[in-house]
Amino acid sequence: MEGPFISVEKKGAQDERNIITCNEEVCRRFLDASKGLVKYVGIAPERNEDAVSFIRAMKDKVNISLAHTNAGYDKAMEAFQAGANHAVHLYNAMPAFTHRAPGVVGAVCDSEHVDVELICDGVHIHPSMVRATFKMMGADRMILISDSMRATGMPDGQYTLGGLDVNAVSYTHL
């Protein structure tokens, strides 16, 4: 699940009305309702004063992912050291990876237990960055995803995504 404990600033196509802070009871209800189908829960640790406690409480019940987050390097490292073990669609819906502010990407590089997703559609991430990420992380940590939506392969036009209206133009709907 990419959320609902994510950042409003990095929400992407997520419906802002459904974004909430980390809540163990809500998370347990999701897990119980899914009868074991939910394997990952995405959080933005910077939105939650006590994200570390949430991660420690939930990490043995579900994989904790950093997703749709505006976390800097230190906050991401704190989450990974507490037990988060996954990063959702690396480079997308998170701060840029730079030499002075490595952000989530830098924290992932420094946390060998963390697996990463990459959207490999040739649009979300340049092919050179895909190759560089394989070199940085190693193939064993990589999960390649499409992140496609209902409009994939369809002509430009109006579509819906999670109940939201989307105007899909050109490559934006891959």
Region spans (language model):
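Active-site donor-binding loop signature of nucleotide-sugar glycosyltransferases
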Residues: G3, H89, A168
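Divalent-metal coordination cores built from histidine and acidic residues
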Residues: E2-L37
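Conserved small/polar residues in nucleotide/adenosyl-binding loops
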Residues: T172-H173
